[in-house]
């Protein structure tokens, strides 16, 4: 371990990172640009564990004029004055899982901490009055305009985003708290708010109509996260260690990191952005694992997936206008805005002709994590042990033994209690989609052809499978439909051998009844 670099895993305080000689990916040129733009009110949305808190802490140190922390960084040569401003930094992550009264108490506690520094106007009773008084007193006592930093502004609301009764109550508390910011404009140097989701300006910042949302601006695409160039420049030695552990070349290790943790884009065009939490953990441990997803899938996400009756295949590649996903979550009519803003889907392409963005799951880690979370919707009493048969399935399919794979699947499904209402074909289509996605395969459903829709298309690095499903019929009927409608013709230019698979499910036994596989045809 001697000589290994220190990665700031879980460290969100800029001063601790710099003083502890941890690896820091320099974002300070963007920090300088952001703090010297036309707008002094900035909002940034990024998924959890994407260094939003570290960015907020960086701003805190910068506005406190702590030049010594920025030695060797880009901003050292850009900033000439290093003025010390009074900073009010509110971390709202401590206000999760609270009702209205506890939330008010938590806000009062935060205000009290700064009132110990700048004093309190006893006539200011409510949280909005106390915040306004704090800003004015800090300005009067220091002679400098005040910086307000609000990290995870939406944390008090995320747990109740699906609760129609509780959300308005907590939203009103937060709206009241933020309300003085516009009136205090003469006393403010900079206001920065960051969080995961985008709540409507009217609902939270009804008085603050001059916030600039930089979440989808190309110049800030890499403000949070790590680009491939940054990774190659600063982490090459540890990529080599990972390669040794995996038994591959450094380029092979880079490919594995890319497929597992890369693929985020928050605008278009944009460099590929790696999930910083997963990437740094993988390099620190010299192994691949489900770090980001394993660190905690929010309860609210699973509850919203169920509320909107989201099927696994609905999370794949789809096209949207920006206002359909970069939209306030409390007004959403489907789950797309929440999935996008939470980092479970991301931008993959954009058409300037139609203004449509293609959104898809960013990488293998997120895809497998999502499917693990959704599998219990189809299988009762599902546990992590259930992944062992899935791993055996992967081994069979990787060896091009589809017959063995389906036999394993038949046994697996027959031994696990199923959910209710399984007597329709779509249930089994969703179940297969989820399981085969867990294997890391490319899976698509209801694929259009000139003569109808294919139930499912699966692709491995070596083979393309055209699959037709039937319920309480026969596999021969399914295969006959594939041949009659000549579905494989649609994929003639795929460059892979095509295998036709007819599968019949037996709803009485809750598993595969029979199947038939027709050998590969080269395309």
At which residue positions do the language-model features occur?
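Structural motif
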Residues: 147, 463-465, 499
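Mg2+/Mn2+-dependent nuclease catalytic core
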Residues: 167-172, 471-488
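Metal-dependent nuclease catalytic cores in nucleic-acid-processing enzymes
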Residues: 177-184, 337-345, 433-437, 481-501
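Conserved catalytic cores of phosphodiester-cleaving nucleases, focusing on short active-site segments
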Residues: 432, 456-471, 485
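Domain-level recognition of nuclease-like catalytic cores that cleave nucleotide substrates
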Residues: 490, 496-523
